[in-house]
Amino acid sequence: MAERQTGTGPGPVTRTHRHHAPASGGACSNLLRRIQDHVPNSTQLVGFLTLLISGGILLLLTGLTATSAAMGFVLFAPLILLTSPVWIPLVTIFFLLTAGFLSTCGFGVAALAGGTWLYRYLSGRHPLGSERVDYARSRIADTASHVKDYAREYGGYLQSRVKDAAPGA
């Protein structure tokens, strides 16, 4: 910031330094020079002022909201306490009916989607995910076949071992 380029045209560029006027106190002059070197530019100043104004507005709105909530609670607390034996059971029944209705609708949609998928799968239309079901079925069949072969192989082995242990059997 202390250096500025001067010159016009293709000639040599010279740099001039901005010198501060000497003050009477050496330490005070040094402090002022440091402060002047760190002065924010206009963009930073406008950003800071915007932040300050926005923060003040939000703080004011927060105070108004908290105050109105407290005043509303103070004014309506007796009314809420006096009428609670009437509206608490009504709200509970309404909540349970709404939850039951929405659960029934959700289960109905899930059953309809599952039934549609199963119908498409069994009719051979190959719905989304049928390849995975076919793969799982083939894996289960392969595993059952291996278990069956293993049982045949080692089942005969165990029967011969039993005959060795009890020759008359």
UniProtKB/Swiss-Prot annotation:
Its main location: other. It is found in: Lipid droplet; Membrane. The modification N-acetylalanine is found at residue 2. GO terms for cellular component: membrane; monolayer-surrounded lipid storage body. The chain crosses the membrane at residues 45-65, 75-95, 99-119. Coiled coil: none annotated. A motif (Proline-knot) lies at residues 78-89. One of its GO terms (biological process) is anther development. It is a multi-pass membrane protein. Keywords: Acetylation, Lipid droplet, Membrane, Transmembrane, Transmembrane helix. Residues 1-25 are annotated as: Disordered. Expressed in pollen (at protein level). The proline-knot motif may be involved in the targeting to oil bodies. PANTHER family: F27J15.22, OLEOSIN. Belongs to the oleosin family. This is Oleosin. It comes from Lilium longiflorum.
